[in-house]
Curated annotation (Swiss-Prot):
Main subcellular location: nucleus
Listed GO biological process terms: tRNA (guanine-N7)-methylation; tRNA modification
Gene: wdr4
Keywords: Nucleus, Repeat, tRNA processing, WD repeat
InterPro entries: Trm82 (IPR028884), WD40/YVTN_repeat-like_dom_sf (IPR015943), WD40_repeat_dom_sf (IPR036322), WD40_rpt (IPR001680)
Biased composition (Basic and acidic residues): 445-467
Family listed: Belongs to the WD repeat TRM82 family.
Subunit relationships: Forms a heterodimer with the catalytic subunit mettl1.
Protein name (record): tRNA (guanine-N(7)-)-methyltransferase non-catalytic subunit wdr4
């Protein structure tokens, strides 16, 4: 077992090189009875008690890419969200029967359940977060007009809107006390908002130079947050203060590193050490970075790696009450499995793990059309985030003819809500005009931001009266 990372040439996810559809999301119930994962773009369940895969009604599956899978805290329900704009509730006590589907009319990126699992927050591709009741459907009604010119005003008055970012939100987490909401976006920042009054911002965690990939809260230290990024670093934060406590840089070990925090866990009750399991996109290693919880710092000298001979890891979860590391792989050949397991203490491979055997026994050969498979793979890759630009970057690009980065920063119309209308013919208009075209929902939702918006509206009204 090596204690230092070895550079392995990147394996680009090319559609023609993928022999099986990879598992892109893995999670488990807190009682360890169930493991849920996305395979072949469908929800799959492994029942630990019965030691077998569950069978879901074929007609109840999502029609789009599943974006999130989360068990309720009492483990009686499973909530999934999808790019098909639906939330689905599955009854874990009744063979995972789909008991409710909620049409959000939003292209969902990620979601999180509230404290009592009565509501779910979802972020859409425009950087907005909306709240939906899982109990009272009357709270989820949204009036939609057929008049496209009224779309922006519609979304402004959407009673489900909680808050918004300038750019797409890639991850959201509640603080352990559920009084704060932490949101990370493609514009390199992490925002800490009071909840439910999210316009009241506690702090910003600023320091990443590229998009944030994932954020994780630290068990045993409610004040600490871990983040990964396209800048190749792992950062440790005091999130309430917005203070970066430590940065671990992996660019010297991996070219164009993209770090993805996967799981952070406490080794046992008698130690002050936590372990962060993370991956680096296109690297054939699983990394384990020890962390001293009391001191609030990573121990870089004790970095461990689990080399994978078959493929790079995609999604990683800790199962069997913390005893097993379960990872999904990118199968570039028919011989490569879709899942692999390791002992979390010895880091030795568990070839006889019952979950892995069951998952790998399913025919995962791709049956998706090339375009569908491409969409699935793009939803896995974290570097997809650099393909999308926020309204703030759109504003800068339109007033500067210089090349800002590369073509990946151009707006992808599929990833901007259908109700958002940006006319490419307006590139030569001045900054004020472009700023006015931005929906208010994407403006900085602070008390100061609210004042700025009110001032702009007053100026507009004054100009109209003068005319």
């Amino acid at each position: 077992m090596s204690t230092t990372a070895v550079f392995i040439p990147p394996q680009i996810m090319v559609t023609s090189n993928v022999e099986k559809v990879p598992i892109s999301i893995i999670t488990h119930s807190s009682d360890s009875n169930f493991i849920a994962y996305r395979l072949n773009n469908k929800l799959n369940i492994f029942d630990n008690k019965l030691n077998k895969l569950g069978e879901l009604e074929s007609g109840s599956q999502h029609t789009g890419i599943i974006r999130s899978i989360e068990f309720t805290k009492n483990n009686q329900s499973l909530i999934t969200s999808s790019s098909d704009k639906f939330l689905k509730i599955w009854d874990t006590t009744n063979n995972f029967k789909n008991i409710k589907s909620i049409n959000t009319n939003k292209k969902i990126i990620c979601s999180i359940l509230n404290k009592d699992d009565s509501e779910i927050l979802v972020s859409d591709k425009c950087g907005d977060v909306f709240k939906y009741s899982l109990i009272d459907d009357s709270k989820n009604k949204i009036e939609v007009s057929g008049d496209k010119s009224a779309k922006h005003d519609e979304k402004e008055s959407d009673k489900n809107l909680v808050f918004g970012h300038y750019s797409s939100i890639v991850d959201i987490k509640f603080s352990p006390c559920f009084n704060y909401l932490l949101s990370a976006d493609r514009d390199e920042k992490i925002r800490v908002s009071h909840y439910p009054n999210c316009f009241d911002i506690e702090s910003f965690c600023l320091g990443h130079t590229k998009y944030v990939t994932e954020i994780l809260l630290v068990p045993g230290r409610d004040d600490l947050l871990i983040s990964g990024s396209g800048d190749g670093t792992i950062k440790l934060w005091n999130w309430k203060q917005g203070k970066c406590l430590q940065t671990v840089d992996f660019n010297s070990k991996h070219e164009n590193a993209i770090t993805i925090p996967q799981v952070v866990f406490k080794v046992d009750a008698t130690t002050t050490t936590n372990q962060l399991i993370f991956s680096i996109e296109n690297s054939n290693n699983i990394y384990i970075l020890p962390m001293n919880v009391e001191k609030g710092e990573f121990n870089q000298s004790e970095l461990k790696t689990i080399p994978l001979t078959q493929s790079s890891p995609i999604s990683i979860d800790l199962i069997d009450n913390g005893k097993t590391i379960l990872a999904s792989l990118l199968p570039t050949t028919k011989e490569v499995d879709v899942a692999i397991a390791f002992d979390s203490t010895t880091l030795s491979q568990q070839s006889d793990n019952k979950v892995v055997i069951a998952i790998n026994s399913v025919d995962a050969s791709t049956t998706l059309k090339p375009a569908e498979l491409k969409s699935v793979l793009e939803s896995i890759e974290k570097k997809q985030y650099r393909k999308h630009v926020s309204y703030s970057k759109q504003m800068m690009n339109s007033t500067d003819n210089k090349n800002k980065e590369d073509d990946d920063l151009s707006l992808d119309e599929q990833d901007i809500d259908d109700t958002t209308d940006i006319n490419n013919n307006n590139k030569n208009k001045n900054q004020e005009t472009i700023q006015d075209s931005r929906p208010l929902k994407l403006r900085k939702m602070t008390i100061e931001g609210d004042k700025e918006i009110q001032k702009e509206l007053e100026e507009k009204e004054s100009k109209k009266q003068e005319e």
